[in-house]
């Protein structure tokens, strides 16, 4: 059975982690083995009682200073890019990228020849240049966009 490696940048109680929680809960009930990589705290922590879910977390939060927020974002992308290579020799792995933001693990997944699936929640073309760039990257890296 396919192992799902799921990446979500910021685990809080907003819409995208709540939607992801519903999706992952359905997959967990079907018996899929899921590795969840996300920040500490939030709605996704409610899945931790499933034995077939393993969570890897990192500290991430927003700052009032946009430069600090972007530095933190880039650091998480580098961390998750490197972390992703732990699944290099696993067969039957799908990288599930929740939202546009986790571009580091999506890039690593493509480099390793893994299947990359994006769950696209937001309309990037109303959010600004940064999100438009991320949407373009998603279109190049994704095998499938949900």
Regions found by a protein language model. Give the residues of each.
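Residues at the starts of beta-strands that form the adenosine-phosphate
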Residues: 3, 33-35, 115, 143-144
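Short N-terminal targeting/anchoring amphipathic segment
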Residues: 5, 73, 83-101, 117
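N-terminal strand-loop element at the rim of the active site
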Residues: 6-13, 26-72
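A short, glycine/small-residue-rich beta-strand->loop->alpha-helix junction that serves as a flexible
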Residues: 7-22, 125
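Histidine-centered beta-alpha loop that forms part of the nucleotide-sugar donor binding/catalytic region
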Residues: 8-9, 60, 98-100, 120-123
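Short, well-ordered alpha-helix to beta-strand connector turns
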Residues: 31, 52, 91-92, 113, ...
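An aromatic- and histidine-rich active-site surface loop
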Residues: 77-80, 94-112, 127-128
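A conserved, positively charged/aromatic
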Residues: 117-146
């Amino acid at each position: 059975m396919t192992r799902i490696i799921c990446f979500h940048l910021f685990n809080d109680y907003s819409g995208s982690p709540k939607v992801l929680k519903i999706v992952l809960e359905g997959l967990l009930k079907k018996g899929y083995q899921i590795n969840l990589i996300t920040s500490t705290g939030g709605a996704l922590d409610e899945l931790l009682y499933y034995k077939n879910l393993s969570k890897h977390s990192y500290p991430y939060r927003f700052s009032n200073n946009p430069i600090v927020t972007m530095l933190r974002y880039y650091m998480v992308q580098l961390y998750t890019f490197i972390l992703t290579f732990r699944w290099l020799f696993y067969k039957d792995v799908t990288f599930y990228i929740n939202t546009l933001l986790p571009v580091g693990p999506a890039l690593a997944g493509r480099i390793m020849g893994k299947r990359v699936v994006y769950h696209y929640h937001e309309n990037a073309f109303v959010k600004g240049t940064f999100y438009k760039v991320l949407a373009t990257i998603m279109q190049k890296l994704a095998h499938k966009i949900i």
